[in-house]
Amino acid sequence: VLVLLARAVATGSVLAALTDPAVVDALALSTLTTSICVVLVLVLGIPLALLLARSHFRGSALLETIVDLPIVLPPSVAGIALLLVLGRRGLLGDPLAALGLTLPFTTAAVVLAQFFVAAPFFIRSARAGLAGVEREIEDAARVDGATERQVFRYVTAPLAAPALAAGLVTAWARALGEFGATIIFAGSIEGRTQTLPLVVYGEFQSSNLDASIAASAVLVIAALIALLLVRGLHWSRALDARGAG
């Protein structure tokens, strides 16, 4: 990784990449799709994480396994799974077609592929953070007249915030680097489905090594920033725990 960054900086290829139309389009598309993905992860992930953290019911272990499954699945298998369910000839292909919706090889397919592989990382972190919130504190808020929504907004969420934020950053980084599921389910159409990882692959296939290295360097820099943010959040949690102790 350090060699890649050093070469990219030494040759000035990173700056050149930022003016390359294909890289610029891919960067813009990646920014758009990962932003939408993060919103979906938050909206759908928090209720599921809360359910897994607070409720013990028959089948909860199975549900946890299903949620975690995309983490261990090869990305290409995830892409095939999405095609089998949401493709034109997939399980939901006909109902979607009846609604006039076609998902494969669209920008929406990119978002779905990113969400499929990234959401479990957020849910795992959020589940751990929410499970660590002391029920007594929440009960005290309820005694004072707080509604369940107010308890979550003003008590639970702030206490679990470091874990939620760390999970969200990790999910965003995973979505940004997603390749296998995207290329199978969404393809690599410039301006529509070609994200940065697909540019790296495409330029390498075209024997344009400098452009491939430059696009890779952009991804590495983004990954390093995400890693530093996660480490900072974990450090903040450790300090808070020591202070509380």
Predicted regions and their residues:
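Glycine-rich helix-loop "coupling/hinge" segments at transmembrane-helix boundaries
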Residues: 84, 181-207
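The alpha-helix within a helix-turn-helix
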Residues: 141
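Glycine/proline-centered hinge or cleavage motifs at structural transition points of membrane proteins
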Residues: 144-146, 158
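Active-site/ligand-binding-proximal alpha/beta "capping" segment
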Residues: 152
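Membrane-water interface segments at the C-terminal ends of transmembrane alpha-helices
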Residues: 1-12, 21-131, 155-180, 203, ...
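Short glycine/proline-centered loop/turn elements that form peptide/ligand docking sites
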Residues: 133-137, 243
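Short coil/turn motifs that cap or connect alpha-helices
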Residues: 58, 146-148
